């Protein structure tokens, strides 16, 4: 059970996980923007897979912090 309430916008109800997804997407873009110039992507074998795993980790952290 989440602490966040149901989010209603223009008559549409969104579950609390929607807010967590948006927050984690913004944090993911921030982390990716920091990691790109650092050269970490030169060491990564599959950048798309790395980005997916990074987003999953960020989403997990956000969802654990908001529960």
UniProtKB/Swiss-Prot annotation:
Keywords annotated in UniProt: Cell membrane, Membrane, Transmembrane, Transmembrane helix
InterPro entries to which the protein is assigned, alphabetical: DUF1656 (IPR012451)
Compartments where found: Cell membrane
Membrane topology classification: Multi-pass membrane protein
TM region(s), chain numbering: 3-23, 43-63
Keyword Transcription: no
Source organism superkingdom: Bacteria
GO cellular component: a single term: plasma membrane
Pfam families in the cross-refs: DUF1656 (PF07869)
NCBIfam families: PRK11594.1
Family from the record: Belongs to the AaeX family.
Protein name per UniProt: Protein AaeX
């Amino acid at each position: 059970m989440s602490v966040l309430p149901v989010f209603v916008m223009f008559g549409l109800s969104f579950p609390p996980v929607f807010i967590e997804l948006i927050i984690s997407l913004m944090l993911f873009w921030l982390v990716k923007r920091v990691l790109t110039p650092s050269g970490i992507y030169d060491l990564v074998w599959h950048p798309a897979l790395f980005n997916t795993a990074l987003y999953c980790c960020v989403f997990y952290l956000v969802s654990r912090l908001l529960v």
